[in-house]
Design a protein with these regions (language model features):
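Membrane-interface interhelical connector segments
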Residues: 33-50
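Extended, low-polarity transmembrane helix blocks
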Residues: 1-33, 50-55, 59, 66-137
């Protein structure tokens, strides 16, 4: 029973990683490539705060999606989302600890999901796991 649960846990971890990476990539893609088009990002400067966030979201999201360098990438992205939460949603708002009221649900959830991935790793279906197997024999 424990072996089955462990196998299932690793697969679910991989599904969480793939889904989070894909959704995060969409945020970066919207900022940098206009896909999907989000009007507020029209004319976005690459080296602005949003532009740098978009680079992290697109590149980091791709790495997380693939499960390559999952732990360090997820750690950086968790920090990015924590900063985004406090700068973009809490600053000047009286609802610091109520994401529903300050619009920061996505940033808070991404931050905690990436923190979990930084601790847990990429899971069974990751390039990290494949490379680790290759090195071991």
């Amino acid at each position: 029973m424990n072996a089955n649960w462990e196998n299932c846990r690793s697969m679910v971890l991989s599904v969480l990683r793939i889904a989070a990476g894909y959704m995060f990539m969409l945020h970066g893609s919207a900022k940098l490539l206009g896909l999907p088009h989000v009007e507020m990002f029209d004319g976005l400067q690459l080296f602005s705060l949003y532009g740098v966030a978009g680079m992290l979201e697109l590149g980091g999201g791709l790495l997380v999606l693939l499960g390559l360098f999952t732990r360090p990438t997820a750690f950086i992205l968790s920090g990015q989302m924590a900063v985004a939460y406090f700068i973009g949603h809490v600053a000047g708002n009286g609802y610091a600890l109520i994401p529903l009221m300050n619009g920061g649900e996505a940033a808070a959830l991404f931050s905690f999901v990436f923190l979990y991935l930084a601790a847990a790793g990429g899971g069974k279906w990751s390039l990290d796991a494949m490379l680790c197997k290759k090195r071991q024999g």
